[in-house]
Curated annotation (Swiss-Prot):
Pathway in which the depicted protein is active: Amine and polyamine biosynthesis; putrescine biosynthesis via agmatine pathway; putrescine from agmatine: step 1/1
GO BP, sorted A to Z: putrescine biosynthetic process from arginine, via agmatine; spermidine biosynthetic process
Family membership: Belongs to the arginase family. Agmatinase subfamily.
Organism: Escherichia coli O1:K1 / APEC
Catalytically driven reaction(s): agmatine + H2O = urea + putrescine
Designated name of the protein: Agmatinase
Annotated Pfam families: Arginase
Keyword field contains Ligase: no
InterPro entries attached to this UniProt entry: Agmatinase, Agmatinase-rel, Ureohydrolase, Ureohydrolase_dom_sf, Ureohydrolase_Mn_BS
Amino acid sequence: MSTLGHQYDNSLVSNAFGFLRLPMNFQPYDSDADWVITGVPFDMATSGRAGGRHGPAAIRQVSTNLAWEHNRFPWNFDMRERLNVVDCGDLVYAFGDAREMSEKLQAHAEKLLAAGKRMLSFGGDHFVTLPLLRAHAKHFGKMALVHFDAHTDTYANGCEFDHGTMFYTAPKEGLIDPNHSVQIGIRTEFDKDNGFTVLDACQVNDRSVDDIIAQVKQIVGDMPVYLTFDIDCLDPAFAPGTGTPVIGGLTSDRAIKLVRGLKDLNIVGMDVVEVAPAYDQSEITALAAATLALEMLYIQAAKKGE
């Protein structure tokens, strides 16, 4: 099965350059990369406004504005000198075939993880996290989930492909342990009896970052962690370009500080999802997503440099 294309994809949903202008490598499985970036241009599982399939391209495009900074503030070092990161482009699948996307993404992830790589993925709608969790759980065992979102995505509607059901399905499949997982920024209806610790947007906005991070560390412990960031966790003032925006969210400043605070966790996989550039203003949503993705890489580089 061919998981990725091995030539530049000039379609409307892809770019011919990597995130941060990092090297493109269409054969990442045999590379010496520490982290591999994969775009997943998929939005068939959305329940709101479509357009997330263009998210990976938008994130890469705006990331060129971040590529110039070497000793990034406040880290004061260049992530690229500590981590070998490559961008392998976008998952190639038949648009319109959700099952093929899911199977090919899981196979791609399993192959990367078996080769000793770690993954940072760009959605696409949030459903793409489920096949990624399946692959990571095969490699690392049951994981903790640190989940930034306006929605819990724990809804049991019986639909196989729905971006609001992944974290109902994942515990059922034994992929994640809700009792060691935390959902941050929630501000919509949710089930209080599913085992997850929910830190709603009201308390996240009112409490100190240090206090929140201390609680997250206590909940997660030393389990392997999958970190997923739905961009609608941010308030629409900072991230209007998404399918299901909800007011009352986090500022971009608070989100960045929270992500930086996760440095000491055993993070084994990461994604940023739900950027829909058709609804964006001056690329601020894509810029927020690209910046958060960069901060995720920096926390990995900081750990490697210790």
